[in-house]
Amino acid sequence: MLVVEDDPDLGETIVTFLKEEGLDAKLARDGDQAMRLVDQLHPSAMILDLMMPRRDGFSVLRELRADGRINGLPVIVVTAIFGLSERLYATELGAADYVTKPFELDELLERVRNVLASRADEPAATERQTT
């Protein structure tokens, strides 16, 4: 599980919570680091903030989609942006789910488990490592 969040407190909180729930989670603080870690770790899923410095979440989604890495990688977008157009655009780019801030950690965990369960049902899931 890769958590991409530029707010250090929120990022660490999410990673710690996921680890306490038995999931292996790593933190990337921006979109550039996220792309490097996707290639290194081959995560089972990604939690992705949209508004980040250097490379935003939309840019990450576009790159993942352009080269096919989004296939088999469920991405949950987490953002303070409430707009319907942003939600639709994230979905068009391949996001599996969209959670608005603020959110409850239990709600995020439920969504993570849902996308992981959906991913486990896909044949390509067995070809990727779980991180």
Spans of model-derived segments:
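Acidic catalytic/metal-coordinating carboxylates
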Residues: 30-33, 49, 56-62, 94
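Short amphipathic alpha-helix used as the core "switch/output" element in two-component signaling
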Residues: 36, 58-71
